[in-house]
Curated annotation (Swiss-Prot):
Single Gene Ontology BP annotation: regulation of DNA-templated transcription
Alphabetic keyword roster: Cytoplasm, DNA-binding, Phosphoprotein, Transcription, Transcription regulation, Two-component regulatory system
Reported function: Component of a regulatory phosphorelay system that controls B.abortus cell growth, division, and intracellular survival inside mammalian host cells. This signaling pathway is composed of CckA, ChpT, CtrA and CpdR. CtrA is a response regulator substrate of ChpT. When phosphorylated, directly regulates the expression of ccrM. Is also probably involved in the transcriptional regulation of rpoD, pleC, minC and ftsE genes.
InterPro entries in UniProt: CheY-like_superfamily (IPR011006), OmpR/PhoB-type_DNA-bd (IPR001867), Sig_transdc_resp-reg_receiver (IPR001789), WalR-like (IPR039420), WH-like_DNA-bd_sf (IPR036388)
GO molecular function: phosphorelay response regulator activity; transcription cis-regulatory region binding
Gene it is expressed from: ctrA
Protein's name according to its UniProt entry: Cell cycle response regulator CtrA
Native source organism of the sequence: Brucella abortus (strain 2308)
Domain Response regulatory: 2-116
């Protein structure tokens, strides 16, 4: 999961980064509202975490500008201001949720997962595709009840495919999701990851086809062919 953190307090930012990275999130941090706006417009994040007290501009202004710019990325406000007026104002400007500092790591992670699931159209933490089950909270994968052990990158790719099931994802989208524009390898690495992911799924699924190649475009996750499932 790719997270943009806009927070000017370096100690708090570092603490939040550690919380998120311990859950294998990719975190990109800035302490300036203007830069946060630029990054939010330019890159595809799963969620933006926004502090309200920034040195160059108000967090409310960051929020308002992003929404006026048609940036639909879910935004979670993290603020030391606990007044009901602050919460109402933040939600009114287009925030998806509001958390008051200090907060517990488990609650932050749970809120992030819930917000991202809703934004992707998944109210539940489990996405099922045929016999394939991806648990977004536990970060586990099963096929017909059998656990499939994936590397971090393999899981991130399958999670993205599951969240956008039925949508063709380009190799550039995978690279951006996995590396966020930092030290990106060549595009062909995506083919390697997909090949390994398919082999692991095939080994426990009776060669049911979940990940389809869309030649010249990318890859898409689809429900396995009904006849193939019946004959398996």
């Amino acid at each position: 999961m790719r997270v943009l953190l806009i927070e000017d307090d370096s100690a708090i930012a570092q603490s939040i980064e550690l919380m998120l990275k311990s859950e294998s999130f990719n975190v990109y941090t800035t302490d300036l509202g203007e830069e946060g706006i630029d990054l939010g417009k330019l890159y595809d994040y799963d969620i933006i975490l926004l502090d309200l007290n920034l040195p160059d501009m108000s967090g409310y202004e960051v929020l308002r500008t992003l929404r006026l710019s048609k940036v639909k990325t879910p935004i979670l406000i993290l603020s030391g201001m606990a007044g009901i007026e602050d919460k109402v104002r933040g939600l009114g400007f287009g925030a998806d949720d509001y958390m008051t500092k200090p907060f517990h790591k488990d609650e932050l992670i749970a809120r992030i997962h819930a917000i991202v699931r809703r934004s992707k159209g998944h109210a539940q933490s489990v996405i099922t595709t045929g016999d394939l089950v991806v648990n977004l909270d536990a970060k586990t994968v099963e096929v017909a009840g059998q656990r499939v052990h994936l590397t971090g990158k393999e899981y991130q790719m399958l999670e993205l495919l599951s969240l956008r099931k039925g949508t063709t994802l380009t190799k550039e989208m995978f690279l951006n999701h996995l590396y966020g524009g930092m030290d990106e390898p060549e595009l062909k690495i995506i083919d390697v990851f997909i090949c390994k992911l398919r082999k692991k799924l095939d080994a426990v699924s009776g060669n049911q086809s979940y990940i389809e190649t869309v030649w010249g475009r990318g890859y898409v996750l689809r429900e396995p062919d009904a006849e193939m499932r019946e004959s398996a």
